[in-house]
Amino acid sequence: MKKKILAFGLISALFCSTPAMADMNRTTKGALLGAGVGLLTGNGVNGVLKGAAVGAGVGAVTEKGRDGKNARKGAKVGAAVGAVTGVLTGNGLEGAIKGAVIGGTGGAILGKMK
C-alpha cells in the first residue's frame, strides 16, 4: 500500500507541476493519466504499463493537426491488424477486442511519430 501511495504521489507531482505541464503534449499527458489510473486499479507495474500505453494512444489520437491525423490513421490500421490477429490466435471475440485495443494503441503512437 505504501508503494502505491508513493508512486501515485510521484505521478501526481510530475503531472501537476507547472513547468512540466507547459511543455507536455496530449500524448504525454495521456500516458501519465493512464499510468495513474493503472496504478489505482491495483494491478501493480503491469497495470501502470498498460494504462500508460492506452493513455498515450488516446492522447496521440486527440492531438491537433498533422500529428493527430497521422495518429488516427495509424490507430485504424493497428486496430484492424490487432483484431484479425486476435481472432486468428483462436481467442474469438475476446481476442479480437484485446487485439484491436492493443493494435490501435500501438498504431496511434507510431502514426504520431511518422
UniProtKB/Swiss-Prot annotation:
Family: Belongs to the UPF0757 family.
Domain of life: Bacteria
Cystine residue pairs: none
Phylogenetic lineage: Bacteria, Pseudomonadati, Pseudomonadota, Gammaproteobacteria, Enterobacterales
Protein encoded by which gene: ymgG
UniProt protein name: UPF0757 protein YmgG
Upregulation: By heat shock (shift from 30 to 45 degrees Celsius) (at protein level).
Parts forming coiled coils: none
Pfam families according to UniProt: Gly-zipper_OmpA (PF13436), Gly-zipper_YMGG (PF13441)
